[in-house]
């Protein structure tokens, strides 16, 4: 994976960071362990209308198309329109008592998972989301 492919927006202001191959690999491992059951290939099993494609992430409220926004969502998930907190329905750090797979996820893991999610459309194209 080239540095260009591993460069992602880290915030809404457009600042970027390059994730290492190790960070991408760790993000993949955590995604596969904690997220892929419902989000394999970027699809949302419980709601196919909302997926992890760049377009869907950008159109969410607030937009979830950067690392900080995805990390925030994993900590405190809300509906696509941003109005309703859904941590009892969607795995998150806030609901780790209900969703045990979230219990041992670190801040670094969240960062790496977000990078992994943002990488997938670059390498999988239309097969993601």
From Swiss-Prot:
The keyword Cytoplasm does not apply. Its main location: membrane. Heme c binds at residues 35, 38-39, 90. GO terms for molecular function: electron transfer activity; heme binding; iron ion binding. Binds 1 heme c group covalently per subunit. Gene3D superfamilies: Cytochrome c-like domain (1.10.760.10). It comes from the Bacteria. Keywords: Electron transport, Heme, Iron, Membrane, Metal-binding, Photosynthesis, Photosystem II, Thylakoid, Transport. It is found in: Cellular thylakoid membrane. GO terms for biological process: photosynthesis, light reaction; respiratory electron transport chain. Belongs to the cytochrome c family. PsbV subfamily. This is Photosystem II extrinsic protein V. The gene is psbV.
């Amino acid at each position: 994976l080239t540095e260009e492919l591993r460069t992602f927006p880290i915030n809404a202001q457009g600042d970027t960071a390059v994730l290492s191959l190790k960070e991408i690999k760790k993000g993949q491992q955590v995604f596969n362990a904690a997220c892929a059951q419902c989000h394999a290939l970027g699809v949302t099993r419980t709601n196919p209308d909302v997926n992890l494609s760049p377009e869907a992430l950008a159109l969410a409220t607030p937009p979830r198309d950067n690392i900080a926004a995805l990390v925030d969502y994993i900590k405190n998930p809300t509906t696509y329109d941003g109005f309703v907190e859904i941590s009892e329905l969607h795995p998150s750090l806030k609901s780790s008592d209900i969703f045990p797979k979230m219990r041992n996820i670190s801040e670094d893991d969240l960062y790496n998972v977000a990078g992994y999610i943002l990488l997938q459309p670059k390498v999988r194209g239309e097969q993601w989301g």
